[in-house]
A protein has these predicted regions:
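PEST-like intrinsically disordered low-complexity regions enriched in serine, proline, threonine
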Residues: 45-46, 107
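Extracellular, beta-strand-rich glycan-interacting domains
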Residues: 182, 187-191
């Protein structure tokens, strides 16, 4: 957990530094991200710290495309700067594609993601705001114990996530798909929120 906090702290320092250097909206240079896009700042920051990048073939960011649970694990591994290359064998889920096994394995080994309880991860399922927030909040040190979920997974995530600002500008629906723009926004919200400190 200490290493995750260190990685998040370093990423946050990078974000703060970049925040001072961003000249104006649209600097990310994605042709499909308008200057007035609600998530343009988050997209720029996440691109600059190499957490989320655009489509190599088209040069687009695709801010309105839904994100899968597998893609969210990639975002989390990049956000936390996990050395994912060594974690392919740590992925216990049979439905995760070969290319993504190191990312999901690294997140699983660091208690950021969990599966559905039937041996699957739901690799191609769209991620919801509550699921994504749970991953972000575990990385921040929340939900380390089963009693943290005593009111149920969704209730606990929405309550704590709302309190620390994870859902700001996104909403906390448990049943809608998140877009790439919203994931960027939530990641930036997480980087700007408080981490749990244990004494």
């Amino acid at each position: 957990m200490r290493n995750l906090k260190r990685a998040l702290s370093l990423t946050l320092a990078s974000v703060m530094l970049l925040g001072m250097m961003v000249v104006g909206a649209g600097a990310a240079g994605f042709p499909d991200v308008a200057d007035d896009n609600d998530n343009v700042e988050a997209i720029e920051v996440l691109q600059a710290i190499e957490v989320m990048v655009g489509n190599a073939d088209t040069g687009n960011f695709e801010p309105d495309r839904s994100v899968t649970r597998t893609e969210m694990a990639v975002v989390m591994a990049n956000l936390l700067k996990l050395d994912y290359k060594y974690y392919e064998a740590s992925c216990p889920f049979w439905d995760v594609p070969t290319w993504a096994r190191p990312y999901v394995g690294a997140c699983y080994a660091n208690k950021i993601v969990s599966g559905y309880g039937d041996g699957t991860y739901g690799a191609l399922d769209p991620i919801t705001p509550v699921q994504a927030a749970s991953m972000m909040m575990r990385a921040l040190g929340y939900f380390q114990y089963s009693e943290d979920y005593k009111d149920g997974f969704e209730t606990a995530t929405v309550r704590q996530g709302t309190q620390i600002g994870i859902f700001e500008g996104i909403g906390s629906s448990a049943d809608k798909d998140m877009t790439r723009g919203q994931v960027a926004r939530m990641a930036l919200n997480a980087l700007e929120s408080e981490m749990v400190t244990f004494t």
